[in-house]
Amino acid sequence: MNQRSARSVLSRSGVVLVDKPSGPTSHDMVAKLRRIMGTRRIGHSGTLDPMATGLLVVGVERGTKFLAHVVTHDKRYEATVRLGVATHTDDAQGDVLSTASPQDLQALTEQQVREAFAAQRGDIMQRPTSVSSIKIDGKRAHELVREGHDVVLPERPVTIFSLEVLDVVVDDATSCIDARISVHCSSGTYIRAIARDVGEALGVGGHLTQLRRTSVGPFDVSEARTLEQLEEDPSLTLNLDEAMVRCFDTREISESEGVDLSLGKWLKPVGNKGVRAAVTPSGQAIALVEEKGKRASSVFVARPAGMD
């Protein structure tokens, strides 16, 4: 790659915040964005189910490599859980496994429903939904389920920082209970699993009927654009400098230290903890660096030598 084309790639590198509609898969969204943005180097920081809407954080060009360091950020969701019906996918698109009787549902109080959701808060062990993208012996769990296999994934630790029940409404036609919730959780949490587990705890079954992701780390859906808006203006939401500084605390470096990082060299530690965005006086975010022992080494170089 010559220097001119390298600079062109860097100028096109960054993050696009997209408001995903219900229907397409995250893979479908990437395919559409490749056409809109005019590059195949497109990737996202976390899958949204087809039925889900909301924030999809998309990396463009070198932004795809940057997003690998953002996937562990916490997330926020708004969702509707239907209590009274369990499905094999834990959402409305799955086959019905069980339906609670009207008598059992009418016996539940709103206080019991709220307490069952409250029990999900904090550091918990959660069993991922069987139709997740988690791989088992090289194959994704949802593919195995579609092939007819009985998939039960092991529990793993997640953190529910907050879970608020916004309202509880009874569907008069079915006696099912719809609970609208707001969740702030760690990466790797399955909201469908919360619906399933609350339904099981109440003895009536439960599944997800609506899901909207409202934030990923420092990125909020209020900044996101629809595919139609991006068709009209296929521009970055944040360039690479802006994205790195938003996601990470910074370490101020000299221009010469910036050159060293661009060449793959390490810097002297200054007592920082965690990953930092190394930023020059001119405002360029050169790399993400992390101190270990007597070195501050780069974990991602945004501007390799020749891309300045």
UniProtKB/Swiss-Prot annotation:
GO BP annotations, alphabetical order: mRNA pseudouridine synthesis; tRNA pseudouridine synthesis
Pfam family, one: TruB_C
CDD domains the record matches: PseudoU_synth_EcTruB
Active site residues according to the UniProt entry: D49 (nucleophile)
Catalytic activity as recorded in UniProt: uridine(55) in tRNA = pseudouridine(55) in tRNA
InterPro entries for this protein: Dyskerin-like, PsdUridine_synth_cat_dom_sf, PsdUridine_synth_N, PUA-like_sf, PUA_sf, tRNA_psdUridine_synth_fam2_C, tRNA_psdUridine_synth_TruB, TruB_C
Keyword ATP-binding: no
GO MF annotation list: RNA binding; tRNA pseudouridine(55) synthase activity
Catalytic activity, EC: 5.4.99.25
Domain of life: Bacteria
PANTHER family xref list: PSEUDOURIDYLATE SYNTHASE TRUB1, TRNA-PSEUDOURIDINE SYNTHASE
Similarity comment: family membership: Belongs to the pseudouridine synthase TruB family. Type 1 subfamily.
Protein name listed in UniProt: tRNA pseudouridine synthase B
